[in-house]
Amino acid sequence: MNNSIPERFIFQCALFKNLEREVFMTHGYVDSHIIDQALRLRLKDETSVILSDLYLQILQYIEMHKTTLTDIIINDRESVLS
């Protein structure tokens, strides 16, 4: 993988936030399984090598940190609601 996001910024990057927002608009909620599916669909259809690398990196990171992702999503929702 030639292109990457620093690991500490993966869940804060615009690419992930846009994906999360689109999943929420489509399904009404976000969890690690739906994010995983959405990433796999994007990765399958992506023609840009750069975006493919970034989607793959995010997907791998989510697979390693599923509980962390759930906590981040919950905390993000709470901060938006307050």
Curated annotation (Swiss-Prot):
- Domain of life according to the entry: Bacteria
Q: What are the recorded Gene Ontology BP terms?
A: single-species biofilm formation
Q: Tell what triggers its expression.
A: Strongly induced at 16 degrees. Expression is repressed by YcgE. At 16 degrees Celsius with blue light irradiation, expression of this operon is absolutely dependent on YcgF for relief of YcgE repression. Part of the ycgZ-ymgA-ariR-ymgC operon.
By what name is this protein known? Answer: Uncharacterized protein YmgC
